[in-house]
Amino acid sequence: MGIADYFRERRRSRRGSASVAKERLQIIVSHERAERGGPDYLPMLRQELLEVVRRYVTVDPDAVRVDVERDGPHEVLELNITLPEREEEGAQR
């Protein structure tokens, strides 16, 4: 491998990282657009669900995610809650 090959290889890898960066940016932009187009009630729904879950489990507000996906004529409400890990049995007693 000569020095010229080394620089050619570096150029190829830069193109690869540029395409990866572009793809990631497209994902972020599409996610932001999807959030803007969501129903107006989602923030209130998220807050109320968080209050209900907190009656039973201590949950971080960032651990609740509410999304609406469109599948043809149907809308699907997706709710994800990351629950805290259980403590050991001996520590609770």
UniProtKB/Swiss-Prot annotation:
Coiled coil, from the record: none
Taxonomic placement: Bacteria, Pseudomonadati, Pseudomonadota, Gammaproteobacteria, Chromatiales
One Pfam family of this chain: MinE
Protein name: Cell division topological specificity factor
Keywords carried by this UniProt record: Cell cycle, Cell division
GO biological process, one term: regulation of division septum assembly
InterPro entries noted in UniProt: MinE, MinE_sf
Family to which this protein belongs: Belongs to the MinE family.
Function according to Swiss-Prot or TrEMBL: Prevents the cell division inhibition by proteins MinC and MinD at internal division sites while permitting inhibition at polar sites. This ensures cell division at the proper site by restricting the formation of a division septum at the midpoint of the long axis of the cell.
